[in-house]
């Protein structure tokens, strides 16, 4: 059962995919790959944009947040702007708890 629902578009889906791939690469360098990260990456890849809402649990929210923070740190280290990542992190941190939105 999903705890939260994220209204997701193509840009967010691509950002989630890149962030989770980087997170998996960092985990493999440290020698411990968490199955939850792999499962979340597969869930994001299988997500259809026609559904409009990605259902996530608390653990999946934590995985996304950690992956996006790592991507943000990577961008800041390269001297790039992280405004888009910051806005997505806020959306992940404060997701909707209802499947039905009022807009």
What function would you assign to each model-found segment?
Residues 1-103:
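Positively charged, low-complexity terminal tracts
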